[in-house]
């Protein structure tokens, strides 16, 4: 073990005598080196603060000159936090003495991590009230510094259910109606976490029932998460605003909560009148809650109970509230339509499958197609059908969800990528199942495969039409890889000449938009790379794939295309030791003696320990022109401007 690691481990374990021994008599430069980051990104001071070793922290700062602001990587609950200062780590872990010590030694109370999380947010997240009081009450920490998502300390306290911290932040003037980047408020966080007491507290402070970026109110947020207590509280009969006009606000004269004009949860019912729940909102909340009971809680009787209440509210005094007429019935939902009468509702009890379709219909109507939960539960229901062997029903639902995602989400959305991968895994399983069972297994339809492949190409086209290149190159690479896996599976399905033509048209669309994955890989590079095999948890296709390579070449893929290291697909095939694929590339016109950035030919990259070299004979493909080009390059003979441009490009190829 080297000295650097030994110092880190001693700080981690709180072994001050050992640490003093290791660092004694060290010069300033050597101390700076030893107190710097280790391989994992942490520092001795950071890990000592994380572990709560006060004596080690003070020794490193006072006697070794460790910076109280030096940030690094630290682990919490299985997650790596990048750019965390020691004060953040101590606050997150709840080590009050270490927090006070670091602040006394000059640590910035509002110093953030790479995600803009403050020490105060870390303490709020983990419920350390004493640390929160220290940071805010003693050192004036800024309550309103939000993380990169616009999520504030009050919001995270509400979401995690830390009532006393939420109360304290409100007392200190936290903005109760602050909105995050996605438009949600602290009320939304309470509704999603099911914390009724904190929700009452927020309402007593005049929190408003706002809609977030998806059009969701806190009431609907409680419905989709299945928190019946929140839903019941918000839809219960409340006194009208006029009834309370002129009523003095309890606690209004209080010095601590005057900024928010709130007092205690017990007074919340008086203030609920500021945001009464309409009959229509209550109906939708109960209907959506019933859908949640079907799909999330798997409680069909509980769902019926909530749907009955919603139906009763629709028919109560004040005028009948009809459901909107559907524009068209959906094949994926088995052409089901929502029930509209109490009799139709009661008939559902004998048809569980129809109840599940009702849940999907209700969710799509209320949340709309752009809300992630809408497509998520359609995919969930499809997966349940697949598990029971009903692959056709699954494919219909998944195709409907995929269309919904592509029409409403940004290109390369993780949810859309997950849908494509699920299709590839399902198709692979169906093909294997049919191979094992013969006529008893489901026959995979060409139309289903080519339809999903075409949508995959469309996703790449959408991403490349953006004003700038895709932010996440890994996600873009994965999208191309999934398309290649779908093509791999399609090669296992018998095609008519017309279907073969349609397949080639789809592949041509992909090649025409010239997508580039990691390190500048073209689809042809990826088709000859074994790393393309790894796209998900389950096995789909195997790469390198000669069949996929041939299809790409037939559709016009350039066998001499280059990646960022000037490797051609032939180089990558050689690195993967695939002589059969190399032969196919050479027959398609790939130059055997073309060199990469490191002046290596594909033949030179073949594994000498294997027999592949004996099957590939480079001199069968090298021309005198190729040898002359390499001689010019090897001897540094100037040629630019003295020969035609076409010949210059040929020499540069070598």
Curated annotation (Swiss-Prot):
Q: List the Gene3D superfamilies.
A: Ankyrin repeat-containing domain, Tetratricopeptide repeat domain
Q: Which UniProt keywords apply?
A: ANK repeat, Cytoplasm, Mitochondrion, Phosphoprotein, Repeat, TPR repeat, Ubl conjugation pathway
InterPro entries the record matches: Ankyrin_rpt, Ankyrin_rpt-contain_sf, TPR-like_helical_dom_sf
Key word ATP-binding present:
no
Q: Which gene encodes it?
A: Fem1al
Q: Pathway it acts in?
A: Protein modification; protein ubiquitination
Q: What is its main location?
A: mitochondrion
> At what positions is Phosphoserine found?
108, 608
GO BP annotation list: protein ubiquitination; regulation of ubiquitin-protein transferase activity; ubiquitin-dependent protein catabolic process via the C-end degron rule pathway
The subcellular localization recorded is:
Mitochondrion; Cytoplasm
Point out the signal peptide segment.
Answer: none
Source species, domain of life: Eukaryota
| GO annotation, cellular component aspect | Cul2-RING ubiquitin ligase complex; mitochondrion
The segment annotated Disordered runs over: 241-265
- What Pfam families does this protein map onto? Ank, Ank_2
Quaternary structure, per UniProt, is: Component of a CRL2 E3 ubiquitin-protein ligase complex, also named ECS (Elongin BC-CUL2/5-SOCS-box protein) complex, composed of CUL2, Elongin BC (ELOB and ELOC), RBX1 and substrate-specific adapter FEM1A.
The residues bearing each ANK repeat, given as ranges, are: 2-31, 40-70, 82-111, 115-145, 149-178, 182-211, 214-243, 519-561, 565-594
Q: What is this protein called?
A: Protein fem-1 homolog A-like
Species source reads Mus musculus
Q: What is the lineage of its organism?
A: Eukaryota, Metazoa, Chordata, Craniata, Vertebrata
Select a single GO molecular function from the record's annotations and give it: ubiquitin-like ligase-substrate adaptor activity
Q: Which family does it belong to?
A: Belongs to the fem-1 family.
Instruction: Give the protein's biological function.
Output: Substrate-recognition component of a Cul2-RING (CRL2) E3 ubiquitin-protein ligase complex of the DesCEND (destruction via C-end degrons) pathway, which recognizes a C-degron located at the extreme C terminus of target proteins, leading to their ubiquitination and degradation. The C-degron recognized by the DesCEND pathway is usually a motif of less than ten residues and can be present in full-length proteins, truncated proteins or proteolytically cleaved forms.
TPR repeat intervals: 283-317, 375-408
Q: Biased-composition ranges for Polar residues?
A: 253-263
Q: Does the keyword Nuclease apply?
A: no
């Amino acid at each position: 073990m080297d000295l650097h690691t030994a110092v880190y481990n001693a700080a981690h374990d709180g072994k001050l005598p050992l640490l003093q021994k290791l660092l004694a008599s060290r010069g300033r430069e050597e101390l700076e080196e030893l107190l710097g980051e280790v391989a994992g990104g942490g520092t001795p001071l950071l890990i000592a603060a994380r572990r709560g070793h006060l004596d080690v922290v003070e020794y490193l700062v006072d006697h070794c000159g460790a910076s109280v602001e030096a940030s690094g990587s630290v682990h919490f609950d299985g997650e790596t936090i990048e750019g965390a200062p020691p004060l953040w780590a101590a606050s997150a872990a709840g080590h009050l003495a270490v927090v006070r010590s670091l602040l006394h030694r000059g640590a910035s109370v509002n110093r953030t991590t790479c995600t803009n999380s403050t020490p105060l947010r870390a303490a709020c997240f983990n419920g350390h009230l004493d640390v929160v009081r220290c940071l805010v009450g003693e050192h004036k920490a800024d309550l309103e510094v939000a993380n990169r998502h616009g999520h504030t300390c009050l919001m995270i306290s509400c979401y995690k259910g830390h009532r006393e911290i939420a109360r304290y932040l409100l007392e200190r003037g936290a903005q109760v109606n602050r909105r995050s980047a996605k438009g949600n408020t602290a009320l939304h966080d309470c509704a999603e976490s099911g914390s009724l007491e904190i929700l009452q507290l927020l309402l007593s402070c005049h929190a408003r029932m706002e809609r977030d970026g998806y059009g969701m109110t806190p009431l609907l947020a409680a419905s989709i998460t299945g928190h019946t207590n929140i839903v019941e509280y918000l839809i219960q009969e409340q006194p009208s605003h006029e009834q309370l006009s002129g009523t003095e606000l309890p606690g209004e004269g209080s010095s601590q909560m005057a900024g928010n004009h709130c007092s205690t949860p017990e007074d919340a019912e008086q203030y609920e009148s500021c945001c009464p729940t309409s009959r229509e909102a209550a109906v939708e909340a109960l209907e959506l809650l019933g859908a949640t009971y079907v799909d999330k809680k798997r409680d069909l009787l509980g769902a019926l109970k909530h749907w009955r209440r919603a139906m009763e509210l629709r028919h109560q005094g004040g005028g009948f509230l009809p459901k909107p007429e559907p524009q068209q019935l959906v094949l994926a939902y088995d052409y089901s339509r929502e029930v509209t009468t109490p009799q139709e509702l009661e008939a559902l009890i004998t048809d569980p499958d129809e109840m599940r379709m009702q849940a999907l219909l209700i969710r799509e109507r209320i949340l709309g197609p752009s809300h992630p939960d809408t497509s998520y539960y359609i995919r969930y229901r499809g997966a349940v059908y697949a598990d029971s062997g009903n692959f056709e029903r699954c494919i219909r639902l998944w195709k409907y969800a995929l269309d919904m995602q592509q029409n409403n989400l940004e290109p390369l959305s993780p949810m859309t990528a997950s849908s494509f991968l699920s299709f590839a895994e399902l198709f692979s399983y169906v093909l294997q199942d049919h191979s094992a069972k013969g006529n008893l297994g489901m026959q995979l339809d060409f139309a289903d495969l080519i339809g999903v492949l075409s949508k995959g190409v469309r996703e790449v086209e959408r991403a490349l039409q953006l004003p700038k290149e895709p932010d996440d190159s890994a996600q873009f690479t994965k999208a191309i890889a999934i398309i290649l896996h779908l093509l791999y599976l399609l090669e296992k399905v018998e095609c008519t000449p017309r279907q073969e033509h349609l397949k080639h048209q789809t592949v041509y669309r992909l090649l025409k938009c010239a997508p580039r994955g990691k390190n500048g890989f073209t689809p042809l590079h990826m088709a000859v790379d074994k790393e393309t095999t790894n796209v998900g948890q389950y096995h789909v296709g195997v790469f390198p794939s000669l069949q996929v390579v041939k299809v790409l070449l037939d559709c016009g893929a350039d066998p001499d295309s280059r990646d960022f290291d000037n490797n051609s697909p032939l180089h990558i095939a050689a690195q993967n030791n695939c002589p059969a694929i190399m032969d196919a590339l050479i027959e398609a016109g790939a130059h055997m003696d073309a060199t990469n950035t490191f002046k290596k030919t594909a033949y030179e990259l073949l594994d000498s320990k294997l027999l592949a070299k004996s099957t590939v004979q480079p001199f069968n493909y090298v021309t005198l022109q190729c040898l002359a080009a390499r001689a010019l390059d090897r001897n540094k003979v100037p040629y630019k401007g003295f020969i035609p441009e076409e010949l210059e490009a040929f020499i540069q190829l070598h």
